[in-house]
């Protein structure tokens, strides 16, 4: 029974005793027992007076004996892991807390650079999914979970809620660990007390996995714990895929750490083993069994800070950072998708002016931007410069040039010329890939026939105009 319940029961007992005493006193007065009392009533009267007196000061200041705190198995080992119990409603969870000075580096960057990148977002004025403009560093909760399974659903339990956050001159890692399934209410109570101090989650696939898992488990106990905060959410996985899908073998966090962040893990427990270790822990209750999971999660939430710093620097300062041409192209494509044509044009030009193999892809994209702006002449000039390069020219360059010549400039001959070149490029590519579609071939042939017909019609019209002109001249001379 909880301490609160015991106090309520004691209060009820005291009220009953007081009522009983008052009733007895009334009966004695009504019977005319005044002045000298018979001996048999003397003792009862003394007891009554004692019962009706207010509680003495010593009684009021000495609360009932506290409930014994739950015994923590292997408490000394938890202490070595920098973890301590959090007790709520007779249940406990473990909270591990590790602090780092803000100037410490994790991989390529110091944690303190988070201040700089937030200021950069503020100064840029750009509307971007990863923007932290208007936020303080402590508003960002770099969050990750560990669960009993890698799929979703109510049967999947979140047993570790981990995050890192800047607090003053330190980066604090906190991990809320579930030592037994029946303590889930206490787990979320402990987490929500801390999480509500921030406004935005920063995760790696958190929109699709981590936070939906938290919401699902929270729904089952929502009447016993506070509501989940209405967090903003910056999911870095989506940005990582935009930037590095074509460049890296995988966009897993571990690969990105090595290739982009200079973070190299030693003796790291693979994430897929976390559920196995947790079930082993439930059997033994020995924290040494789960230590590898805690260390893995700690590195995850620290790497999220480093990754956010790195991605922000690429997005806002790619012209002066050590950015690959592939990254520069993908950054430009991201800005184009967001409707920021000026930023997209800047990125594409950096690639177009290089001798990189993606140069013609960048020129094609620049032409598309000019076309969107209805600057058709500039678009055609960019595409024609692309055709003159010695590197591979995508067939789409010829297709786009043909469309502009046909629909904007009504130059049938030029449109036909570029369409035939596109068809030849398509046949070469299809031969290499063994993937030539009959539908594609038919589409090319129809376009060529249509342009040839337009060309013949244009020539006939021109011949008719010339013939008419000569007839008119002859008529004038005969007058």
Which residues make up each language-model segment?
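Conserved RNase H-like, two-metal-ion catalytic cores of nucleic-acid enzymes
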Residues: 128-200
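Structural register within alpha-helical repeat arrays
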Residues: 331, 365-366, 400-401, 415, ...
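Residue at a conserved register position within TPR or TPR-like alpha-solenoid repeats
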Residues: 335, 363, 370, 405-406, ...
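Structural motif corresponding to the intra-repeat A-B loop/turn of tetratricopeptide repeats
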Residues: 338, 373, 408-409, 455
